[in-house]
């Protein structure tokens, strides 16, 4: 038989055998990731959580030779008990978990329901620090047959300390795999109309429930060291942009809505103005009514419920203020879920 005849036979045989035995669509994973939470409020769980969090080089950029003796010699021997007492004040004792885990799970469940028109989409959630870990949930998505994954760091404003470290950990998990799925990561959305509108509606709804009208509304964001911003982290500018757009959407003046930064840690200068100092100054200057919201947090947690709802409120009232209200995060509200669903559907275009 000639070479030409052999080719003809092979082509004929190939033509009779379909390349794909079925038209089944490959699964697409959607992974929601938030900061994280301890598994409990006692010393052990708190120490494990803080050790993982404060060992992240994206979070603490100091030389390990300087930082580790401080971390393991001082911080992890003193801070777990104090942080545990704070967490205990907001702990969801019914489910034995922090509000962050409660709300993030609800967000995942509601997103899965909203995407039920896409049967090949699998929604799951993970935490950057603590459980469920990014690595374990990445494994689960791959085991379910996900050939493409959209990873959604749940941070409206980008920072290397938040969004970047989530992506770092995700790709670190994939480095151990033979098969690497196609990846998309949801970018920051500090100026997205659906997000600004959701914040505005949330503020309007909350203010309608109050017996007073706030003279000043603070948009309080988690701070980062000023040196990180000076080196090029766009976080501060994105926070200010969110506040500017929200202020315009609500028709407020610059004195009526101001951006501040909270949760500073350590001796370094952080982004200013500081939230705690601002509420104290407002009270001392005669402002009697204040409201605070946290646009950078998609779910209520220790930094919002306790640091703002309790500590900032106490600072304001103890220094002459009369009315203080914390505006809840978007959480799994209708407005909040519209933001998450809109951004996820946009990233799924061409994949489903």
From Swiss-Prot:
Catalytically driven reaction(s): heme b + 2 H(+) = protoporphyrin IX + Fe(2+)
PANTHER family: FERROCHELATASE, FERROCHELATASE, MITOCHONDRIAL
A cellular component annotation (GO) from this entry: cytoplasm
Gene Ontology molecular function: ferrochelatase activity; metal ion binding
Annotated protein name in UniProt: Ferrochelatase
Organism: Brucella canis (strain ATCC 23365 / NCTC 10854 / RM-666)
Pathway assigned to this chain's UniProt record: Porphyrin-containing compound metabolism; protoheme biosynthesis; protoheme from protoporphyrin-IX: step 1/1
SUPFAM superfamilies registered for this protein in UniProt: Chelatase
Amino acids binding Fe cation: 222, 303
Keyword Cytoplasm: yes
Keywords per UniProt: Cytoplasm, Heme biosynthesis, Iron, Lyase, Metal-binding, Porphyrin biosynthesis
Main subcellular localisation: cytoplasm
Pfam family, one: Ferrochelatase
Functional description taken from the UniProt entry: Catalyzes the ferrous insertion into protoporphyrin IX.
E.C. code: 4.98.1.1
GO BP term, example: heme biosynthetic process
This protein's encoding gene: hemH
Location(s) in or outside the cell: Cytoplasm
Family to which the UniProt record says this protein belongs: Belongs to the ferrochelatase family.
């Amino acid at each position: 038989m000639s070479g030409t005849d052999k080719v003809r036979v092979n082509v004929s045989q190939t033509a009779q055998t379909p390349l794909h035995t079925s038209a089944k669509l490959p699964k697409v994973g959607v992974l929601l990731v938030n900061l994280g939470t301890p598994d409990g409020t006692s010393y052990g769980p708190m120490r494990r959580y803080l050790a993982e969090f404060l060992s992240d080089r994206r979070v603490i950029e100091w030389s390990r030779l300087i930082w580790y003796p401080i971390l393991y010699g001082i911080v992890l021997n003193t801070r777990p008990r104090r942080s545990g007492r704070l967490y205990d004040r907001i702990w969801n004792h019914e489910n034995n978990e922090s509000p962050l885990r409660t709300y993030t799970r609800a967000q995942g469940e509601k997103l899965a329901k909203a995407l039920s028109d896409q049967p090949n989409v699998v929604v799951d959630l993970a935490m950057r620090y603590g459980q469920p870990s990014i690595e374990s949930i990445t494994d689960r998505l791959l085991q379910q047959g996900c050939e493409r994954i959209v990873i959604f760091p749940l941070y409206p404003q980008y920072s290397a300390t938040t969004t970047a470290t989530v992506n770092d950990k995700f790709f670190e998990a994939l480095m151990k795999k033979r098969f690497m799925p196609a990846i998309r990561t949801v970018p920051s959305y500090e100026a997205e109309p659906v997000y600004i509108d959701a914040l505005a509606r949330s503020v309007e709804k909350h203010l309608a429930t109050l017996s007073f009208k706030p003279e000043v509304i603070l948009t309080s964001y988690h701070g980062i060291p000023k040196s990180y911003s000076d080196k090029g982290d766009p976080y501060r500018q994105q926070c200010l942009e969110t506040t500017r757009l929200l202020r315009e959407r609500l028709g407020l003046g610059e004195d009526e809505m101001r951006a501040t930064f909270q949760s500073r840690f350590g001796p370094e200068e952080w982004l200013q103005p500081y939230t705690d100092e601002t509420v104290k100054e407002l009270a001392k200057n005669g402002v009697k009514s204040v409201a605070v919201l946290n646009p950078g947090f998609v779910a209520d947690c220790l930094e919002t419920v306790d640091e703002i709802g309790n500590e900032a409120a106490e600072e304001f009232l103890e220094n002459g203020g009369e009315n203080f209200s914390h505006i809840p995060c978007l959480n799994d509200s209708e407005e909040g879920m519209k933001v998450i669903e809109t951004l996820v559907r946009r990233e799924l275009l061409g994949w489903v």
